[in-house]
Each structure stands twice: as structure tokens, then as C-alpha cells.
Design a protein with these regions (language model features):
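Proline-threonine-serine-rich low-complexity tracts
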Residues: 1-275
Length: 275
């Protein structure tokens, strides 16, 4: 309006108050908010005599939009989405464009492990004339959740001649929210039992993901010796003279084997009946 862009004034040799009017011719610019006006001012006296002058009014958009809401920095778990719907959206206003366009671009830097990284998200608000401004949001992706041991082997009792290898006593398995293949290991603590062939193993299973988060479970393996030895050679019945020795070295020895004890002890006792 002329109140903002300037008013024309005129004088006349006879008319003390010539009428001043204007008309505008508008030419569009390179964007919707820019254009130029050729304003023609006309001064007319009471007798219809007139004169004109021209004014050029150039309308520009050089003001960048204002980002009214830049999402705050945020930390999310590695199994969460980094989509703006989860991490936050930016919004903007502009002095001329009613709907400035808001976009973003990401620059990702790896962390200490494969599942951890940092995103520098640059939000940019641009109006229809290409004026732009930006703000920065930092998105930190962490892996702080330990694996879940989905199958911890049950406590088990085995014979002393059986293997305590997990292939026999049971294997643990695990899943993780981010690592597709958490590592499962175990360690054993052995407590001796009442005899050399009997003992108890406390087996601690450990599931660890690529970021070092871990969880454990325990399995008790009881090793028993409940199988008696086998007498492999029993001394045969025998008849001897009364002046011969009844010692086993003369009458025969028995021998035995055992599933666990390499040297079972063989003893004997006698019951005598008079002839």
C-alpha cells in the first residue's frame, strides 16, 4: 500500500487541491512471494488536466522460515525405529509462505559395537522462494538390553561313566533384541562328592551380545556312581586234600571290573560247615 511504499503529491496553478490517484501493473517474480509493481500516479485538476509519474515497487522474499519446533536430542534402543514418527518431527512457519517445506537428512557415525550408532539429523525448512534454515537433532542408538536365554538346560543326574559334555547334559540357547546371534558359553564349578566317582557340577551358562550385554542361568549336573562292579571271574568250585591250603592263591582268585572305578576291591568271606 502507498502508506508503506510512499505517496505522491501534486500542485496546480489554479486548482488548490488536484486529485492524486494511482493504478498498479503487477508482474510475477521467480517465486510466488516475489513480484514487481509498476505504480502509475496521476494528478488531475478540476478542469481534467492531468500529469503522471511512475514508481517501481519491488516485492522480495529474503526472510528465512522459522523452525518453531526442533525435535530434542533423543536416545533410543537399537530395536526401536529412528523414523521421525518415533524420534520427533520438526515444524516451521514463514513470514510469506503459509506452508514452508520441512525435510531432513541423516549422517550416521558407528558406535562401540555394531548395534550402537549416532545419527546427526539436520532438519531444513525452505520456503517457496528458496530461503532456508536448519536445526540439528542428535539421535543416539544404544544397545542396553541383555540377551534372553530362551532354553536353559534342566538340572540332570547322570552316571559316572557318562560324559558331562553339553551334548549329553543339554545345551542353552538365547535370543537378543538386536544381535541375531548372541554368543552362548558356559563355565563349570565342580564340588566333590562322597566318593571319587561322584561329584556335582554347577554349570553357569552365559549369553552375550555384540555390545557386551549378558545374562546367565545355572544348571546343576549331579554325577552318581550307582552301578555295582561286575565280577568277571569268579573262582570255580574245587575239592582239595585236607592238608592243602584253603588260601585263594591255592583255591582260585576272583576278579572284577567297574564302570567308573578302574580298580574295584575284591574281598572274600568264608562260611565253614563241618563234614
Amino acid at each position: 500500500l502507498p502508506l508503506n511504499t510512499g505517496l505522491a503529491s501534486a500542485t496546480d496553478n489554479c486548482d488548490p487541491a488536484p486529485v492524486v490517484t494511482y493504478s498498479d501493473a503487477t508482474v510475477a517474480g521467480e517465486c510466488p512471494q516475489e513480484y514487481s509493481i509498476t505504480r502509475t500516479w496521476t494528478a488531475t485538476d478540476a478542469c481534467g488536466n492531468s500529469s503522471t509519474c511512475s514508481q517501481s515497487v519491488i516485492v522480495e522474499d529474503t526472510t528465512v522460515p522459522t523452525i518453531t519446533s526442533c525435535p530434542p536430542d533423543v536416545t533410543v534402543e537399537c530395536d526401536e525405529s529412528t523414523d521421525p514418527m518415533n524420534t520427533g518431527l520438526a515444524s516451521a512457519t514463514d513470514n510469506c509462505d503459509p506452508a514452508p517445506v520441512v525435510t531432513y537428512s541423516d549422517a550416521t557415525v558407528g558406535g562401540q559395537c555394531p548395534q550402537e550408532y549416532t545419527i546427526t539429523r539436520t532438519w531444513t525448512a525452505t520456503d517457496a522462494c528458496g530461503n532456508g534454515t536448519n536445526c540439528i537433532q542428535i539421535i543416539t542408538v544404544d544397545d542396553s538390553t541383555p540377551p534372553t536365554i530362551t532354553d536353559c538346560p534342566a538340572d540332570v543326574t547322570i552316571e559316572c561313566d557318562e560324559t558331562t559334555d553339553p551334548g549329553n547334559t543339554g545345551l542353552a540357547s538365547a535370543t537378543d533384541n538386536c544381535d541375531t546371534a548372541p554368543v552362548v558359553t558356559y563355565s563349570d564349578l565342580t564340588l566333590e562328592g562322597g566318593c571319587p566317582q561322584e561329584y556335582t557340577i554347577t554349570r553357569t551358562w552365559l549369553a552375550t551380545d555384540a555390545c557386551g550385554n549378558s545374562s546367565t542361568c545355572s544348571q546343576i549336573i549331579t554325577v552318581d556312581d550307582s552301578t555295582p562292579p561286575t565280577i568277571t571271574t569268579c573262582a570255580a568250585n574245587i575239592t582239595i586234600e585236607c592238608d592243602e591250603s584253603t588260601d585263594p592263591s591255592n583255591t582260585g582268585l576272583s576278579s572284577a571290573t567297574d564302570n567308573c572305578d578302574p580298580a574295584p576291591v575284591v574281598t572274600y568271606s568264608d562260611a565253614t560247615v563241618a563234614g
